[in-house]
Amino acid sequence: MTEKKYIVALDQGTTSSRAVVMDHDANIVSVSQREFEQIYPKPGWVEHDPMEIWASQSSTLVEVLAKADISSDQIAAIGITNQRETAIVWERETGKPIYNAIVWQCRRTADICEQLKRDGLEDYIRDNTGLVVDPYFSGTKVKWILDHVEGSRERAKRGELLFGTVDTWLIWKMTQGRVHVTDYTNASRTMLFNIHDLDWDDKMLDVLDIPRAMLPQVRKSSEVYGQTNIGGKGGTRIPIAGIAGDQQAALFGQLCVKEGMAKNTYGTGCFMLMNTGEKAVKSENGLLTTIACGPSGEVNYALEGAVFMAGASIQWLRDEMKLISDAFDSEYFATKVKDTNGVYVVPAFTGLGAPYWDPYARGAIFGLTRGVNSNHIIRATLESIAYQTRDVLEAMQADSGIRLHALRVDGGAVANNFLMQFQSDILGTRVERPEVREVTALGAAYLAGLAVGYWQNLDELQEKAVIEREFRPGIETTERNYRYSGWKKAVKRAMAWEEHDK
């Protein structure tokens, strides 16, 4: 029998699908990536073609094996991680979607959400699903599809239509329609799942008029769900053995599996998650309560805060403001000045996320004086990412009663040493940057590998986790508090801006 040398992680993201091959030491052997089309039918609406998601993801799986000259019988298992909340409805018989995937960023269901609030359901939804009422989550998207595609609700009741988040859709396609499952982490993002009973919530299904017959079975994040024989030479059936939504996969990839451990992912936005162990902590500070992966893929809970604009604000400096020609240049210009000269940038281009949840806030620059130049604005924009992270961390510490000792970081912007040092300064906490930056894929690989015995336990994984660089706070507490109070003042003035125009 051929030795099972590798694990494959499929990382299905918002703008691209990736496949990553890892070896036993958690080194990356090969990567393949394909972008796919973003569809914007109306302002604020975002869709993907589910068939294109599948085509891009399945082709990266074939490519990544061919690139590294690996046959499928050398693969121990496949793990899947995915953009969360994005909703797909398809025909059980044909596997054809009845509508495009409605993406997590899509705001078309704002009216449905307003109605849920008017019906007094906010507390019920927060208490039982852990979520706030927002178009972000899958439930209202599924309702919208059933409301707008003729005859679909009746077909769903008859069991002819299926719903799934992206993980469910991929596994359905990979198993030729034999397996209709999701995991606890993805289910916890639908607004249809009771995170305490660990089952679909009948009241929410009733409120949104979504038939139970169309929902997938919910399973642990680390177990064998089915087999696939797609990809590579040899045509061996490979077990699909791990699933986690992208942010929960990153939390697991960073090995934040104990209560009180936290990670922040710096992508287009920032996603910060803190593991709260076996207790679901209800947030009083605008955070989400969500399901995370425990040491062997079982249910743990986490607090989550999302910042909408992180890397996106650096793109704004480059694309709209033309202050830099490359995102990497931001660090160089930021370090050409000793501080921001009193300037604060609040990048609330699409409102503010956690812990404010103000859709009417708008971007603003405060503290401008005649001596301010472009370097000060670049520096203040980078600093805004760290300030927003502190906002979320303060809320997490208040909710959980846990004082964070170190923040593990990942995502594109962590390559920026200035930002990481300022993050440590403004938090007053160690910031740990890992050697392997692909922590989302790593999390999916770990979950799959543990399920099939490729890795024995977490201790074995801990030995492989290398911190490439640790940043420690370099400013005094009084200075830290002074700077942060300026940020709070700036945010307050940027809030509720849009309403004045209406």
UniProtKB/Swiss-Prot annotation:
The keyword Zinc applies. PROSITE patterns: FGGY_KINASES_1 (PS00933), FGGY_KINASES_2 (PS00445). Its EC number is 2.7.1.30. It comes from the Bacteria. Activity of this regulatory enzyme is affected by several metabolites. Allosterically and non-competitively inhibited by fructose 1,6-bisphosphate (FBP) and unphosphorylated phosphocarrier protein EIIA-Glc (III-Glc), an integral component of the bacterial phosphotransferase (PTS) system. Glycerol binds at R84, E85, Y136, D246, Q247. Pathway: Polyol metabolism; glycerol degradation via glycerol kinase pathway; sn-glycerol 3-phosphate from glycerol: step 1/1. ATP binds at T14, T15, S16, T268, G311, Q315, G412. It holds the Pfam family FGGY_N. Signal peptide: none annotated. Gene3D superfamilies: 3.30.420.40. Keywords: Allosteric enzyme, ATP-binding, Glycerol metabolism, Kinase, Metal-binding, Nucleotide-binding, Transferase, Zinc. GO terms for molecular function: ATP binding; glycerol kinase activity; metal ion binding. It catalyses: glycerol + ATP = sn-glycerol 3-phosphate + ADP + H(+). Sn-glycerol 3-phosphate binds at T14, R84, E85, Y136, D246. ADP binds at T14, R18, T268, G311, G412, N416. It is an enzyme of class 2 (transferase). Key enzyme in the regulation of glycerol uptake and metabolism. Catalyzes the phosphorylation of glycerol to yield sn-glycerol 3-phosphate. This is Glycerol kinase. The gene is glpK.
